[in-house]
Amino acid sequence: KRTIVIQGGPGTGKSVLAVNLLMEFINKSLNTCYATKNSAPREAFLSLLTHSDAKKQVNIKQLFRSPFGLSNVPDNTYDCLIVDEAHRLVKKMYGDWNGENQVKECISASLLSIFLLDEDQAVTVNDIGSIAEISKWCRELNSTLKMPAEAKLVSQFRCNGSDAYIQFIDDILQRTEESVTVDLDELNFDFRIFDSAIELREALREKNAINNKSRMVAGYCYDWN
């Protein structure tokens, strides 16, 4: 029984790697499943792989699941369980009456569990998918834990592939202990700080009038989130 942890910041290709691993294991006739708490990537990958063909979706849908309900899955049911966005795992979700801890249940359900995570992307107090939590349950369930250095993803696939942009944002938000010097002339981005929400709205409207591709993103600031 083995567990592998793959780390990577935002935009480093964790989900792309997860789906490629899924296809690789499926082609080897191994009972494999992709699991993530968020339904959006599951639905997106399902649509992409089946080209929205309903008949194909019936067969492929079983390759994608939520960690919800893994408490009812017998031990070692899967040859491999690939857990994307593992930092979003929680102890228990409403309605999962037999659930105890989703990290534990992911490891229990598979001979090989692969966790893809970024601890800095945990966004609520209920998120428990940390390396410490995974290590704890590996010891409890006698699963050999592997965290090879080469399994840490560092290349940036978003933001025009600019690692400097991510460093710049981290520095602005004071997320790093040391200040990072970034040559802004190399960044093809329009970065501004607004003192007025009205000015921000007007700037977005001007941008949106060009090609209708400008949006305000404000996740996890509303009561229903």
Residue ranges of model-derived segments:
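Signature of the SF2 helicase/ATPase Hel1-core->accessory helical subdomain module
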Residues: 82-152
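The conserved Walker
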Residues: 10
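Conserved glycine(s) of the Walker
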Residues: 13
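Inter-Walker segment of RecA-like/P-loop motor cores
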Residues: 32-80
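Walker A/P-loop NTP-binding motif
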Residues: 17-27
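Hydrophobic anchor at the beta1->P-loop junction of P-loop NTPases
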Residues: 6
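Conserved helicase/translocase motor-coupling segment
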Residues: 18, 124-129, 148-167, 174-225
